[in-house]
């Protein structure tokens, strides 16, 4: 199986080539998310779309917590691989497996019983509450599948392998679309069918990744790691990354609650825009994953010169990419939104107008989001999860402040720029923090 040593070679070429499969994988992931939404909205109507939309941030929180934990748990693997220490890599992989299982069980035990109350707190409209709760229950039960895939994909990325997760995501996407058609349109399972299709697709992707991880025979542990330090180190990185995503999602839920006050059609427009949000940040997320691996391996090898050069180049690449995507979405935004909102549905014109207003506000400020991902992931790869968590806290504060204050003065239009304010709050923390760390790499290395 292919592994990639990112401590040697041209920095920008390594990062870009590593991120390309991730980008394609994210495109396929967004494809099956989009297909979910299109099938649900076209076959079940605007209210079904709104039911998914009002639970978007709640379901994202569970998935993002699991993803954050998996990514944090895998950072020590990248460090160990950068130093070419096989024994250390084996212990890190063994520790990740145990931590992944335990953390998912604890997460479900805490959150699952609270889901109905959270949806009530979000002011979910009564006419879509049952469907929203059913969909959320399925997604949360499926977090075991989500962790299964993300833990294995994170291990592969730590070894510099971004192609296998791409192949896994292609398989998952194709299966998800087929299962959507079968469960939602064929068997008439309704909104639950869309959730079940997603969970099964994650399981298949995880099995594919597991097959390829097992090919790393010299790195596969033969026993469970019993050194408590390894468990502490992974949780030291994984928990702050998970909490960072919790803070972001809480802010998103506050925003959703504010959106819910303005009715189902405003919510449907917001939901359609949110589905395109994933498309907006595909490249940003991919560059981010690449930087976690790149900075992680070079940090383990003490190649601080390569870290400085790589971050500088990926920031410029991110800005150029974001400007190009902004132009495309500004021009073709109405067409993309029309994929989610059927013109024959009740309230379709209103929903389209609201969705377009949200989308255009985000596209203007998209470079800020790309800077956020570039700097946050670089800092995480440097074995510092605290600063990204603090940036998540500032995102939360900005989202809550914007969602509560701006509508007082501007009505529903005040909700359009709230997401942008959250990005600004995070960047204010991340950018100066990274350059402070860059000036003190040797001290940071000794501390971490």
Language model: regions and residue ranges:
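Short alpha-helical transmembrane segments in multi-pass integral membrane proteins
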Residues: 1-19, 77-142, 188-239, 295-364, ...
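N-terminal transmembrane alpha-helices
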Residues: 6-44, 60-72, 76, 101-108, ...
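Transmembrane helical elements of multi-pass membrane transporters/channels
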Residues: 17-36, 138, 149, 172, ...
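Small-residue-rich hydrophobic transmembrane alpha-helices
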Residues: 49-109, 146-165, 269-333, 369-391
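Short runs within selected transmembrane alpha-helices of multi-pass transporters and secretion channels
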Residues: 70, 139-157, 165-173, 194-207, ...
């Amino acid at each position: 199986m292919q592994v990639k040593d990112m401590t040697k070679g041209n920095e920008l070429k390594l990062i870009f080539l590593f991120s390309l499969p991730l980008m394609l994988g994210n495109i396929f992931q967004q494809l099956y998310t989009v297909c979910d939404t299109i099938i649900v909205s076209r076959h079940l109507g605007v209210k079904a779309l709104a039911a998914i939309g009002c639970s978007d941030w709640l379901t994202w929180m569970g998935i993002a917590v699991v993803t954050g934990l998996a990514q944090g748990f895998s950072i020590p693997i990248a460090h160990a691989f950068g130093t070419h220490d096989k024994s250390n890599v084996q212990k890190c992989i063994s520790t990740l497996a145990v931590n992944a299982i335990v953390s998912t069980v604890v997460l479900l035990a805490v959150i699952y019983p609270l889901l109905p109350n959270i949806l009530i707190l979000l002011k979910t409209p009564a006419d879509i509450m049952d469907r929203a709760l059913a969909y959320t229950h399925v997604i949360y039960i499926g977090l075991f599948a989500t962790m299964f895939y993300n833990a294995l994909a994170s291990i592969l990325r730590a070894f510099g392998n971004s192609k296998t997760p791409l192949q896994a995501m292609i398989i998952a996407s194709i299966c998800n679309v087929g299962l959507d058609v079968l469960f939602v349109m064929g068997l008439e399972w309704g909104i639950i069918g869309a959730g079940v299709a997603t969970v099964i697709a994650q399981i298949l992707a995880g099995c594919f990744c597991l097959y390829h991880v097992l090919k790393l025979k010299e790195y596969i542990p033969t026993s469970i790691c019993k050194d408590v330090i390894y468990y502490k180190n992974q949780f030291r990185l994984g928990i702050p990354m998970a909490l960072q995503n919790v803070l972001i999602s809480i802010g998103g839920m506050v925003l959703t609650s504010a959106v819910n006050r303005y009715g189902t059609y405003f919510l449907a427009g917001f939901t359609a825009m949110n589905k395109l949000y994933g498309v907006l940040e595909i490249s940003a997320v991919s560059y981010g994953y690449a930087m976690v691996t790149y900075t992680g391996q070079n940090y383990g090898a003490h190649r601080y010169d390569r870290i400085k050069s790589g971050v500088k180049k990926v920031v410029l690449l991110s800005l150029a990419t974001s400007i190009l995507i902004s132009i495309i979405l500004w021009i073709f935004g109405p067409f993309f939104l029309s994929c989610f909102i059927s013109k024959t549905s009740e309230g379709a014109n209103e929903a389209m107008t609201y969705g377009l207003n949200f989308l255009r506000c985000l596209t203007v400020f998209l470079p800020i989001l790309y800077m956020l991902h570039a700097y946050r992931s670089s800092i995480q790869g440097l074995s510092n999860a605290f600063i990204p968590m603090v940036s998540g806290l500032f995102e939360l504060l900005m989202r809550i402040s914007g969602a509560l204050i701006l509508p007082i003065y501007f009505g529903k239009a005040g909700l359009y720029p709230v997401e942008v304010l959250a990005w600004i709050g995070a960047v204010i923390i991340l950018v100066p923090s990274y350059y402070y760390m860059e000036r003190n790499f040797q001290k940071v290395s000794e501390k971490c």
